[in-house]
Amino acid sequence: MQEKILVTGGAGFIGTHTVIELIQAGHQVVVVDNLVNSNRKSLEVVERITGVEVPFYEVDIRDTDTLRDIFKQEEPTGVIHFAGLKAVGESTRIPLAYYDNNIAGTVSLLKAMEENNCKNIIFSSSATVYGDPQTVPILEDFPLSVTNPYGRTKLMLEEILTDIYKADSEWNVVLLRYFNPIGAHESGDLGENPNGIPNNLLPYVTQVAVGKLEQVQVFGDDYDTEDGTGVRDYIHVVDLAKGHVAALKKIQKGSGLNVYNLGTGKGYSVLEIIQNMEKAVGRPIPYRIVDRRPGDIASCYSDPAKAKAELGWEAELDITQMCEDAWRWQSKHPNGFED
């Protein structure tokens, strides 16, 4: 059955890749994005790759009145909610902006959904809700705690969505806790395109490799890990996007409230990522060790077994593919979508 899905933040990195997978799975898609950390041209690439025109509304989801009108006009059956600010370090400097964007924006979205009787939502949560885990790999039933305002917004939103479901069992909610999405579309024409200096490791590394930035800053080499640098579970953005399509199948069956980790189950350190990117690029990538960032933790990787058992989903693309695809995108488009 073809569903119409409204995707907030659908012009962003994960959003665009998910829109492609949704269209290829036979769904209609409507995108809402304020373009604060994304680019309208990314959706033109999506349309070129899929051959399908994607209705787009340049709207901030805090604008509830406009959202209501969009829901009335488009009548989506479900929402995949990506929109929000997403940088750990930045969130410690400007927490109020994170609470305003992420919390107020989502409450506004949920009001518009409820008023239009659209009660199916897949929420883009994060592994940051686990805080600094006692052990790894991380299971969905681990205790939740957060070490920074970004993570706190994700945890608060999980709680808000849980409360809504408890109050009204007509809601179907899937909380997807992502680990660290990297890579790019295999075409090399769609990838991570941050506005300004990247906050995330991979686009920073690729921008150094392409000569836009001088060297990679490695935040701390004194963590309790094999080489002293932070370990994360990096997942190919296309695998992550496919996880949303799998979650949508689950939600269509009147599933209630469900939580899944979306990761590979394997951790790589910052230095290992740089080494893998050097192989993809074919030359050394300069880096220097600097102080730790506030809010960062030593090691974080998933146990994705629940998603495999219940959604029939697992990550398929390895770290080599992630780095090669990220480099193909960056080398073809050194200035992102402006090229």
Q: What kind of region is each of these model predictions?
A:
Residues M1-A184:
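N-terminal Rossmann-like NAD(P)+-binding domain of SDR-like oxidoreductases, especially those catalyzing
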Residues F13-V19, S42, V88, L109, ...:
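Short, electropositive, low-hydrophobicity segments enriched in small/polar residues
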Residues R40, E170, N180-N200, G211-R232:
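Short, flexible, glycine-rich and Lys/Arg-enriched loop motifs at helix boundaries
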Residues V59, D63, P194-P198, K266, ...:
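Residue-level signature of the cytosolic catalytic core of signaling kinases
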Residues E75, N117, Y165, S169, ...:
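Secondary-structure transition/hinge residues
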Residues Y99, T147-L155, G191-N199, P203, ...:
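Short-chain dehydrogenase/reductase
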Residues L202-D339:
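C-terminal substrate-binding subdomain of Rossmann-fold SDR/epimerase-dehydratase oxidoreductases
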